[in-house]
Amino acid sequence: MVTVEEVRKAQRAEGPATILAIGTATPANCILQSEYPDYYFRITNSEHKTELKEKFKRMCDKSMIRKRYMHLTEEILKENPNLCAYEAPSLDARQDMVVVEVPKLGKEAATKAIKEWGQPKSKITHVVFCTTSGVDMPGADYQLTKLLGLRPSVKRLMMYQQGCFAGGTVLRVAKDLAENNKGARVLVVCSEITAVTFRGPNDTHLDSLVGQALFGDGSAALIIGADPTPEIEKPIFELVSAAQTILPDSDGAIDGHLREVGLTFHLLKDVPGLISKNIEKSLVEAFKPLGISDWNSLFWIAHPGGPAILDQVESKLALKPEKLRATRHVLGEYGNMSSACVLFILDEMRRKCAEDGLKTTGEGLEWGVLFGFGPGLTVETVVLHSVGI
């Protein structure tokens, strides 16, 4: 008779969890940041709030965002005037929209990832779906399983309302699933649609206005598994370790409340300051075991909550400007897509490395770090190992 130890050994993978494919998708509706203040104040019937509009223009100018993608078109907003008010009961309209659109956008990204992976979708054993938009039962994980035609026995995990750090969380969870279940192939999807947070401007709630200047829609999907099949599966990054922590003295720094008026955000403290003050501790904990203490020797993927966070992290750690190139590029081209951002940055980095003829998927370097920052203040730290190109 076999022992429990033997069973456990047989169940576990040999090597580390590895990202085997990446796919991304956005809604078709593209919005230029330079034109957005005029559009936003017009569509929300707020053109009389001239001072507020000037303030919003400055926010948009400083955002370092060139364009964003949004499911909400002018037509949809005209049909749903309560979404354009500052605080009108609108949760039904918002939810009815996102419970359909979130899995749909997720399917687009997942289809691209599955195609790149090159394996039959029947080999997907687990689904991890993450969104801060739209809650129904059965959830977006179920809807995606149906839309893609995955096996009914696929093991699903649904993560709701995690916020901007969750791109790191899904990697941490997928790593554990892949390494503890031999042969597991995990489909990870982050799909975010801002229809749940869009609202008109108000003088008393400037935090909301910051969100209106930064947030965009997007979906990213990964296939993650350990022990890649040689010649068939092509590793992109290895997931070496993953940690989560709540920053000290950060209670209420970022809060989100899902109520009748939709999802409202409150930024109550100096978020960039809190992150930059504490980030080195997370780096030391993650990289000391590897004997790494030069943060410029790493490739960097950081959730671009906004330009101030990136500027302060860069300054605090004395990072060379090129370290956050991929991160700033994604912020500029898509805005802050919450949990999906860091996965878009992974995609941008590996694409640019191949284009530039670099030796590895991590800008020619061996080791890298991925950071997620969000409500809590919660920080996810993932240690990545690049793969030779």
Curated annotation (Swiss-Prot):
Molecular function per GO: naringenin-chalcone synthase activity
Entry GO terms, CC: cytoplasm
Assigned keywords, A-Z: Acyltransferase, Cytoplasm, Flavonoid biosynthesis, Transferase
Reactions catalysed, as given in the entry: (E)-4-coumaroyl-CoA + 3 malonyl-CoA + 3 H(+) = 2',4,4',6'-tetrahydroxychalcone + 3 CO2 + 4 CoA
Pfam family, one: Chal_sti_synt_N
Pathway annotation: Secondary metabolite biosynthesis; flavonoid biosynthesis
E.C. no: 2.3.1.74
Location within or outside the cell: Cytoplasm
InterPro entries, per the entry: Chalcone/stilbene_synt_C (IPR012328), Chalcone/stilbene_synt_N (IPR001099), Chalcone/stilbene_synthase_AS (IPR018088), Polyketide_synthase_type-III (IPR011141), Thiolase-like (IPR016039)
GO BP terms: flavonoid biosynthetic process; polyketide biosynthetic process
Active site: C164
Family matches, as SUPFAM superfamilies: Thiolase-like
Task of the protein: Involved in the biosynthesis of prenylated phenolics natural products which contribute to the bitter taste of beer and display broad biological activities. Chalcone synthase that can use 4-coumaroyl-CoA to produce 4,2',4',6'-tetrahydroxychalcone (also termed naringenin-chalcone or chalcone) which can, under specific conditions, spontaneously isomerize into naringenin.
Family indicated by similarity: Belongs to the thiolase-like superfamily. Chalcone/stilbene synthases family.
Protein name, entry field: Chalcone synthase H2
Species per Swiss-Prot/TrEMBL record: Humulus lupulus
